[in-house]
Regions:
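PLP-dependent amino-acid enzyme catalytic core
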Residues: 1-311
């Protein structure tokens, strides 16, 4: 794609993303609407992949990545590739027959953007080694370049905090790989020494030990690590929990905002279970991902058809 088209697209990014005040379960929160950055390129993936949108890569002709066949990162990379005029190849170790035959959600949108899906077994890096025209992106965008866009997020929050004259701010966001939470805490501490801004998160994909390991892989100095909070019961990623569905519906009813169904319900359940966090003004980061709700919501509606009677 010619670069002037890219420049036009870039102008359309809604940055800094808006922050609004919401009330949920009789408690006031601030909400950072990263889901509104761009209709096709939003949330934490827009932050993680911002570096690849902003810089020149004259040798690159193709993006290669891997992960699940319904991932938000897969969809966002398909948009990035399309915006830059690159090919996009995505590896999965399995894909459900139902999804192949009935494409929907992130998978359908990525295919429509020109993604080529390939089945293979990890490690995937070996498949592209020695090819200098390929940009290889780790699963979920878990890499050092992600810090570039997340630093911008930190600066937006600092500017808003100063504008609102908030001395001590707590931030909450649910984590997959923990990349956003880690780089956010690190940059808030480095850029904003005179104010206390703490990042709290919860592991949605693995457990606390998994998340700590992810943090250490990206940053060895633990003073930059976010605070990890959890619920007492173990939570299995992607499993349908009635409590998750209920809180998601309540969020929509009380705030008018659609949240993601995979991460946000657990995020809000954990946050409400730790009221010590909102003893200070608390900012929740909406990280997008609502395109993936299509498949998840259908599963919830089939499993809990009379949920509204319980709200």
């Amino acid at each position: 794609m010619p670069s002037h088209h890219l420049a036009e697209k870039m102008k359309n990014l809604n940055l800094p993303s808006p922050i609004q005040s919401i009330t949920f379960q009789n408690q006031q929160f601030f909400l950072k609407r990263d889901d509104l950055i761009h209709p096709d390129f939003s949330g934490n993936k827009a932050r993680k992949f911002y570096y690849f949108l902003q810089n020149d890569f004259p040798n690159i002709t193709k993006i290669v990545s891997y992960g699940s066949a319904q991932s938000n990162a897969m969809y966002s990379l398909s948009v990035l590739a399309k915006m830059r005029g690159w090919g996009f190849e995505y590896f999965v170790d399995h894909i459900a027959e139902y999804l192949k035959e009935n494409p929907h959600g992130n998978y359908r949108a990525a295919i429509e953007n020109g993604m080529r899906l390939r089945q293979a077994q990890p490690p995937f890096l070996e498949l592209v080694e020695g090819k200098n025209d390929i940009l290889f992106i780790e699963e979920g965008g878990r890499q050092k370049e992600a810090e570039y866009g997340i630093k911008l997020l930190a600066q937006e929050i600092i500017d808003w905090q100063k504008d609102q004259d908030i001395k001590e701010l707590n931030i909450f966001l649910p984590s997959g790989t923990g990349t956003t939470a880690l780089f956010l805490q690190k940059n808030l501490l480095m850029l904003n020494a005179e104010r206390l801004t703490l990042v709290f998160t919860t592991p949605c994909v693995g457990d606390k030990a998994y998340l700590q390991k992810q943090f250490l892989e990206l940053e060895s100095d633990e003073k930059y690590h976010p605070t990890i909070l959890t619920l007492e019961n173990k939570h299995h990623f992607g499993k349908l929990y009635k409590e998750n569905y209920k809180i998601w519906l309540k969020l929509q009813q009380q705030t008018g905002v659609e949240f993601d169904l995979l991460y946000d319900p657990l995020g809000w359940r954990v946050l409400l279970a730790h009221p010590e966090v909102f003893s200070n003004p608390t900012l929740y980061i909406h990280q997008g991902g609502v395109l993936g709700n299509e498949s998840m919501l259908a599963r919830y509606e089939r499993k809990y058809p009379s949920i509204n009677l319980e709200l």
